[in-house]
Amino acid sequence: SLFELGKMILQETGKNPAKSYGVYGCNCGVGGRGKPKDATDRCCYVHKCCYKKLTGCDPKKDRYSYSWKDKTIVCGENNSCLKELCECDKAVAICLRENLDTYNKKYRYNYLKPFCKKADPC
């Protein structure tokens, strides 16, 4: 669910997920879809593609369990869809951390999604 995703992003990046990534570039946050503006936005694009491959669960609502061991996210679900959902969220949280150095505040909040160019299909 969005709850676990937000928690993972906070743990990996130290940033408030809603404030920092809720409306960022063309792909981070609700809605938005388009050619990624930078590496951070690309993380979100890949994450949305990961969600599209899921069948049998709702990425925004379905809760799953994971643990935080030695600063590593460990997904722990028996249900295959929830496990894949957790892995999608884990991947984006790690990607966002790995790209903190290219995070650009100009793409946060004020970037107009109508100006996003159509992205390649997943």
UniProtKB/Swiss-Prot annotation:
What is reported on the regulation of this protein's activity?
Answer: Myotoxic activity is inhibited by suramin and rosmarinic acid. Cytotoxic and myotoxic activities are inhibited by pre-incubation with varespladib. Suramin inhibits this myotoxin by (i) direct blockage of the MDoS and MDiS, preventing the toxin/membrane interaction and disruption and (ii) formation of an oligomeric complex, resulting in a tetrameric configuration for which both MDoS and MDiS becomes physically inaccessible, thus avoiding any possibility of toxin-membrane interaction or disruption.
- Principal localization reads secreted
Give the region (Important for membrane-damaging activities in eukaryotes and bacteria) as residue ranges: 105-118
Q: Mind telling me which GO cellular component terms the entry cites?
A: extracellular region
Question: Is the keyword Secreted assigned to this protein?
Answer: yes
- Name the PROSITE patterns for this protein: PA2_ASP, PA2_HIS
> What does the record list as GO biological process?
arachidonate secretion; defense response to bacterium; defense response to fungus; killing of cells of another organism; lipid catabolic process; negative regulation of T cell proliferation; phospholipid metabolic process
Keyword match Signal: no
Site keyed Hydrophobic membrane-disruption site (MDiS): positions: 112, 115
State its location(s): Secreted
Disulphide bonds annotated for this chain are: 26-116, 28-44, 43-95, 49-122, 50-88, 57-81, 75-86
How does this polypeptide assemble, per the annotation?
A: Homodimer; non-covalently linked (probable alternative/compact dimer conformation).
Q: Which family does it belong to?
A: Belongs to the phospholipase A2 family. Group II subfamily. K49 sub-subfamily.
Further remark: Lacks hemorrhagic, anticoagulant and coagulant activities.
Task: State the name under which the record lists this protein.
Answer: Basic phospholipase A2 homolog myotoxin II
Q: What organism is listed for this UniProt entry? A: Bothrops moojeni
